[in-house]
């Protein structure tokens, strides 16, 4: 069997990130609550995708890539971090984003511009039918120029990228052992493309077999994620040569906290942003972590997360997305 450190990885983030106790919020919910501060990964504005990109950019460097192409939403944290990582290793970033070209560049779009990314915008209604062709067209254009291109899928959600969150479990395991504390009962994390959840599932089964993982969807329905994440977890475990078997029924997804659509702030998510900011001084965002925290709060209130549980919330970053939604937040 292999370990996550057996795979080639570049150094991008500042690890280990803190595992911070949220006493005020946890007490109000009747649980022991820690937050894994992957908003503090540091590189390119921080966030969970740094863990995945350490493996994915090592692959790009090994292949001597000139152009890195990826996709995401209008305010994609993943796309922003791919742009930063590409520049660090002397590669050109191309971002194909879901949404119309803005009149003003704010939040992650501003940072994309600062990193010098080439941006293409796809109409939201046709995005899913056009995205593969659009990214392939950029790869073909690079090849015609004599350059080598690499396409990184949405969210960096690949079995190789998922190793980043196997490593995160190993990191948290060491942090809890240093504290003299047991494994958590529950881990809660947002999911938009599935790679983070796949890595958490694989790592937890190895190190914390009794810990439940809850993915709070910010985009798709539960059954789509269950199929996708179980397949990715299986492929990730196979990479590691760990004897694990995964089915869709193994994956716990809550899809009732999306709101009207991906990338659109929800009332419950905004309430959670205010609550956490005013209870703990921690900033969440309206696209991912606000909705995921809304899910965590609701699941504790409903008893789906039992009173007295030890809970870890994975903060995947995304604070640049607060600013484009400033008026929505202030009018709430």
List where the protein language model places each region:
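PLP-dependent amino-acid enzyme catalytic core
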Residues: 1-332
């Amino acid at each position: 069997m292999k370990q996550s450190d057996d795979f080639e990885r570049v150094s991008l983030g500042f690890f280990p990130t803190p595992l911070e106790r949220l006493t005020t919020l946890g007490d109000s919910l009747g649980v022991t609550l820690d937050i894994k501060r992957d908003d503090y990964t540091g590189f390119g504005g921080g966030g969970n995708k740094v863990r995945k990109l350490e493996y994915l950019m090592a692959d790009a460097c090994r292949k001597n890539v000139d152009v890195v192409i990826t996709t995401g939403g209008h305010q994609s944290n993943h796309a922003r971090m791919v742009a930063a990582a590409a520049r660090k290793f002397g590669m050109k970033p191309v971002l194909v984003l879901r949404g119309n070209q803005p009149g003003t560049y704010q939040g992650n779009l501003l940072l994309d511009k600062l990193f010098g990314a080439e941006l293409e915008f796809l109409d939201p209604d046709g995005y899913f039918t056009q995205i593969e062709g659009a990214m392939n067209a950029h790869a073909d254009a690079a090849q015609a120029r004599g350059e080598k291109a690499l396409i990184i899928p949405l969210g960096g959600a690949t079995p190789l990228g998922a190793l980043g969150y196997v490593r995160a479990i190993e990191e948290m395991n060491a942090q809890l052992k240093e504290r003299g504390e047991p494994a958590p009962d529950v881990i809660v994390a947002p999911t938009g493309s599935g790679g983070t959840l796949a890595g958490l599932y694989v790592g937890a089964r190895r190190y914390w077999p009794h810990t439940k993982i809850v993915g709070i969807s910010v985009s798709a329905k539960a059954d789509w994620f269950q199929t996708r994440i179980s397949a990715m977890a299986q492929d990730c475990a196979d990479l590691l040569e760990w004897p694990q078997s995964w089915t869709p029924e193994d994956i716990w997804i809550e899809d009732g906290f999306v709101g009207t659509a991906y990338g659109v702030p929800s009332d419950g998510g905004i309430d959670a942003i205010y609550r956490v900011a005013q209870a703990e001084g921690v900033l969440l965002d309206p696209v991912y972590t606000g909705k995921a925290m809304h899910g965590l709060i609701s699941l504790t209130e409903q008893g789906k997360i039992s009173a007295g549980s030890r809970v870890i919330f994975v903060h995947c970053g995304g604070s640049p997305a607060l600013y484009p939604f400033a008026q929505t937040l202030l009018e709430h």
